[in-house]
Amino acid sequence: MEIGLKNGEKLNLEVTSLLLEYVEDYKGGVNQLLKDAQGEKNENGYTRSMYATNQLLYAVIASNYDKPLTYRQAVRLVKLEDISRILNFIAENIPDEILEQQNFNHRI
């Protein structure tokens, strides 16, 4: 999927191992991140949807951009109208095997 960034550049989005590495760091793993992004309430009755959404945006933009980006830079490059498209892209393209694992258990 291709999106246009606020700086005028076009970015082709792909699910890569780098993207999976970024989302792996989220407390609860990718499943919790996707739940939080969808607005599910936590044990205290609060949602973390904006935080989770920005974490996903950072992961996908930073992993597909050619230059290193900070969290803030990556999130600010995304147009508001592209947020739901990006979230849908991630949800549809992360392999089911990864979603079934609560945490990614890498073997050395």
Feature roles, as predicted:
Residues M1-K10, L20, D25-G45, S63-I108:
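Charged interaction scaffolds used for protein-protein
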Residues R48-S49:
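A generic short alpha-helical patch detector that favors 3-5-residue windows
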Residues A52-S63:
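Short, hydrophobic/amphipathic alpha-helical patches that form generic packing surfaces
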